[in-house]
Amino acid sequence: MINNLSISSSLIPDKQRGSVESQVFYLTNRVLRLTQHLQLHGRDYSSQRGLWKILSKRKQLLVYLSKRDKLRYDDLIGQLGIRGLKTR
């Protein structure tokens, strides 16, 4: 029922477990699991609220990474298969 990302956590070395990329990876994995849960339980409003919190945290990390290092940001977006940030 719950599938993990096609990108394994072995791509993230042990030294970089707290890096922005690894945090975005784990948050994306949680988003996918919660999305599948909410497809089965559409009225679970506390899970919806948790999903919004996770999405906002992931967005903050992606904004930080895009300002800090655009190449790492583009590589991460490509690996995870998620949409990039909207530019103003």
Swiss-Prot record:
InterPro entries: Ribosomal_uS15 (IPR000589), Ribosomal_uS15_bac-type (IPR005290), uS15_NS1_RNA-bd_sf (IPR009068). GO terms for cellular component: chloroplast; ribonucleoprotein complex; ribosome. The keyword Ribosomal protein applies. Keywords: Chloroplast, Plastid, Ribonucleoprotein, Ribosomal protein. The keyword Heme does not apply. CDD domains: S15_NS1_EPRS_RNA-bind. It is found in: Plastid, Chloroplast. Coiled coil: none annotated. GO terms for molecular function: structural constituent of ribosome. Its main location: plastid. GO terms for biological process: translation. Belongs to the universal ribosomal protein uS15 family. Part of the 30S ribosomal subunit. NCBIfam families: S15_bact (TIGR00952). This is Small ribosomal subunit protein uS15c. The lineage of its organism: Eukaryota, Viridiplantae, Streptophyta, Embryophyta, Tracheophyta. The gene is rps15.
